[in-house]
């Protein structure tokens, strides 16, 4: 089956921006302020389970606050969440992101995201503050790279990190930047190895 990137590469025109953000422990006013600062009009919640020990980020409370701020809330955790119930997504008890990405429901989620981004400025939201610590980057954005979006990460202080810079940091945090073997690989193979290694690091951490 063709991957998502294979089906959308020919989309014409300027690429729309897709933001990502981690809610972390922000006050809801601060969180909404970050979204507003960057012109976000729709939030796509990609948490598998939309609950949090921070009550402002539980689904019902979050949706209410966003609605009051004129930001649409869309739950895509069933399609794009990183914690899966499907047994075929696991190898020896460990999540396999490549298998998750091949799920028809995951591909449907990417299509829903594409449709949403045609009408709104969208931010993907999960819990983790740091992009390289979260499946929104290591799974979802990996599948979207080379596709229809300019991916930009909203950091905890409100700053923006382009996804290309996030990938450079990914090479660093996985040790692929200075690895002698990795230096013999093509740039695409190096970043592919870095993504795969980060999945293992997060699973063991």
Language-model-derived ranges and their functions:
Residues 2-205:
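Residues lining hydrophobic/aromatic ligand-binding pockets adjacent to catalytic sites
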